[in-house]
A protein has these predicted regions:
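Hydrophobic, proline/glycine-rich low-complexity stretches
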Residues: 2-36, 40-41, 52-60, 74-78
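Short, helix-capping/interhelical loops that line the mouth of catalytic, cofactor-
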Residues: 2-8, 53-113, 149-159
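Short, solvent-exposed segments of well-ordered alpha helices
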Residues: 5-8, 12, 37, 44, ...
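Acidic/His-leaning functional-site neighborhoods
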Residues: 184-218, 222
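C-terminal interaction segments
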Residues: 211-258
Length: 258
């Protein structure tokens, strides 16, 4: 069974993915090139989102439980420059602000988050976990925009499946379709079960084999493809599906309340 990433690993991987993002932006022929996986955005827009977003979350984590919403940084400091060297430095500073705030907070500081009804705690550690996936998926977006998409690193993707299910899917919002049990299986050897019902959705990591006939459907793929599917970058057809695929299609359409 793969381990849950601890804060030092999360910070290391955020830094690694942010560095990979900066490399794409630095070498891209045209920052006005569209990002197909983020309709309506250019690479410049994506860079603005990554930089300003990390600064905003840094300020939110620093404020801790006193924050009543996501803290917005100074507009002038949160605006990405167009000149390449200045943009690279601005992105690096944005990442460093986030890493410094998370490191200072530690994993357990109470923190405002947009998720309030999920299984993920409202803590600095949960923010770090989600920020890793935010940067990792947007790095893939940038790579895909220049025609060079690279699968998410194994340890990032394995944590990403569980993080997405716990934060973005597991909720007390009622599942609007027929109750179902879904198992996501990563070809790297990990699996997660998602129970969907009128009481909401609950996710859990599976420690052993799933008994035959237990889930209504099992969807298998690499952990990277599972994460990219969950974030809407890849279609359901990327999965090797065993069982009734309707719950998988329903999950793509479902937008549970936060």
């Amino acid at each position: 069974m793969h381990p849950t990433l601890e804060l030092p690993d999360l910070l290391r991987l955020i830094d690694e993915r942010a560095t990979a993002f900066r490399a794409v932006i630095a070498s891209a022929p045209d920052l006005d090139a569209p990002v197909p996986s983020c309709p309506g955005w250019t690479l410049a827009d994506l860079a603005q989102h990554i930089g300003a977003g990390r600064r905003s979350w840094a300020a939110t984590v620093a404020l801790g439980a006193a924050a009543t919403g996501r803290v917005q940084p100074d507009p002038e400091e949160a605006t990405a420059p167009r000149e390449r060297a200045a943009l690279d430095a601005w992105l690096a500073t944005s990442t460093q602000q986030l890493l410094d705030a998370l490191r200072e907070a530690g994993p357990d500081r109470p923190c405002w988050t947009w998720w309030t009804r999920s299984q993920s705690p409202q803590s600095s550690g949960a923010v770090a976990r989600h920020q890793l996936q935010e940067v990792a998926v947007h790095t893939w977006d940038a790579q895909a925009a220049v025609g060079e998409p690279v699968p998410l690193p194994r340890e990032v993707a394995l944590d990403g499946v569980e993080e997405f299910l716990s934060t973005c899917v597991a909720t007390t919002s009622p599942w609007p379709y027929e109750s179902a049990t879904v198992v996501y299986r990563a070809t790297e050897g990990a699996a997660w079960r998602l129970q969907l019902s009128a009481e909401g959705a609950r996710a859990e990591r599976l420690a052993g084999a799933v008994r035959a006939g237990q889930p209504d459907v099992t969807g298998s793929a690499t952990a990277s493809d599972l994460v990219l599917l969950m974030y809407g970058r890849l279609p359901v057809d990327v999965l090797d599906i065993d069982g009734d695929r309707r719950p998988l299609d329903g999950l793509v359409e479902w937008e549970p309340e936060d």
